[in-house]
């Protein structure tokens, strides 16, 4: 059974990203899926203030775009040589918003990104982009922990089923499918988590 047909991977330049790319390629190959690797340039750093509209800064912006595009192409060239259907795409804007827009435009059925902590208890594993995607992305999001073994001893699947919401149940089923498949592949322990709010708890 091929669970995923159109996978989206968020690229980054960290040394650990090679492991994340390998995971994405392995999954795409097993599912005979198309893989799209994207990088996102945040435009707000370029478009605020009069000075950023000057010719030198426009030239610098074009240089950065060219560099990022070349980095992206270099990263996926070995994958193309293996015969996998893989594309590169550069997006502009706020990362989590552009990823969600890309998912909606191209009907991606899975998003993969590296875990990037940003300090604090919550930031030990998930950065703000991952948290936004897990809350708002309309397809499953696989956040890959880097820096350890290539095989995982524990996998967590966060589900949010709702008897009155068919779309939410469908998304939870897809997440469970992916988590089960990965746990079998790595012979991992699978943990399924769900949180809920008690109606009226704010007035207790």
What are these regions (language model features)?
Residues 110-132:
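Glycine-rich, Arg-bearing micro-motifs that act as flexible, cationic patches
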Residues 113-115, 141-146:
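Short beta-strand elements of ligand-binding domains
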Residues 129, 137-138:
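Short, structured coil segments at secondary-structure junctions
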């Amino acid at each position: 059974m091929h669970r995923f047909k159109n996978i989206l991977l968020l690229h980054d330049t960290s040394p650990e990203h090679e492991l994340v790319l390998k995971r994405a390629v392995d999954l795409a190959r097993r599912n005979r899926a198309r893989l799209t690797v994207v990088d996102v340039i945040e435009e707000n750093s370029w478009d605020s203030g009069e000075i950023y509209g000057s010719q030198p800064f426009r030239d610098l912006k074009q240089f950065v775009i060219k560099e990022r595009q070349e980095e992206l192409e270099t990263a996926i060239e070995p994958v193309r040589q293996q015969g996998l259907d893989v594309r590169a795409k550069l997006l502009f804007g706020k990362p989590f918003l552009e990823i969600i827009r890309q998912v909606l435009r191209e009907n991606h059925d899975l998003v993969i990104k590296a875990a990037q902590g940003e300090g604090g208890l919550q930031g030990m594993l998930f950065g703000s982009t991952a948290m936004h995607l897990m809350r708002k992305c309309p397809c499953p999001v696989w956040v890959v922990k880097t820096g350890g073994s290539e095989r995982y001893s524990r996998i967590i699947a966060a589900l949010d089923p709702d008897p009155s919401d068919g779309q939410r149940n469908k998304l939870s089923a897809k997440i469970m499918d992916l988590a089960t498949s990965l746990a079998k592949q790595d012979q991992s322990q699978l943990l399924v988590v769900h949180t809920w709010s008690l109606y009226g708890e704010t007035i207790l």
